[in-house]
Regions:
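Acidic surface patches and DE-rich sequence motifs
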Residues: 43, 48, 63, 85, ...
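Terminal peptide-recognition signature
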Residues: 19-24, 59, 66, 70, ...
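Active-site loop architecture of trypsin-fold serine endopeptidases
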Residues: 53, 78-81, 115-116, 136-149, ...
Length: 230
């Protein structure tokens, strides 16, 4: 019985980028229920806060001073943002800048691990259909979770049914991604970030993965942080 030698491609890629992946939580304000309304027990996997709800996504450290890339829709409307590093360290995070045209946000953590490692970025210019990629994030808050697939296409366009924002020049991929993966890195077999996972296409009312995911190319995303062109 022939077996692929370990570690696999996906594991090697994940090992390289995982120290740079963070969990992003945004505490969202929500209207208080009517005074007479009964309290509803929070559902499994959720968290109940007084007058707020918790949104969970992913981010990736791109500058070792604590700058983090994530999706705008992960933290949009949040009254407080916090991140959890690979080491387990939790920190409040400030919003540095927002880029609605790319659904991106730049955060800066107030506390940093001693050995913080920024991810290695790689231009997506030489990326092509069939290239192996790995997505890392916190789907449904579980993670960090790793999935692997290939680039399905380039220069895709997508309009969010929730926010209505048109996004262009996206990388299409088939590595599994679900709510909570947003803002996480899409990396090559070498663990180099080529995109920021941003959206999935599901024409049904379900918010689950059907094999079509989209990522903003890191070339565009890096410009939001002020990183020079590759």
């Amino acid at each position: 019985l022939e077996q692929e030698p370990l570690p696999s491609m996906a594991r090697r890629a994940a090992d390289r980028v995982l120290p740079s992946v963070v969990r992003v939580e945004g505490e969202m304000a929500r209207p208080a229920p009517p005074r007479a309304a009964p309290r509803i027990r929070p559902q499994p996997g959720g968290e109940e806060l007084d007058g707020s709800s918790l949104g969970v996504g992913t981010g990736v450290v791109v500058v070792d001073s604590g700058l983090i890339l994530t999706n705008l829709h992960v933290i949009e409307g949040a009254r407080e943002v916090r991140v959890t590093f690979h080491t387990g360290l939790e920190s409040p995070a400030d919003i540095v800048s927002l880029h609605p045209d790319q659904d991106l946000a730049v955060l800066k953590a107030r506390r940093l691990p001693d050995d913080l490692q920024a991810a290695t970025l790689r231009s997506s210019a030489d990326l092509g259909p069939g290239d192996q990629v790995v997505a890392i994030g916190f789907p449904f808050g579980i993670g960090p979770s790793v999935s692997a697939g290939v680039v399905s296409g380039l220069e895709r366009e997508f309009r969010s049914p929730k926010h209505g924002r048109p996004l262009a020049r996206l990388i299409q991929f088939d590595a599994a991604a679900n709510p909570g993966n947003s803002g996480g890195p899409l990396v090559t077999a070498d663990g180099e970030v080529v995109g920021i996972v941003t959206a999935i296409l599901n024409p049904t009312s379900a918010h689950t993965f059907l094999g079509i995911g989209f990522a903003v190319p890191i070339d565009s995303a890096a410009a939001a942080v002020g990183i020079p062109p590759f």
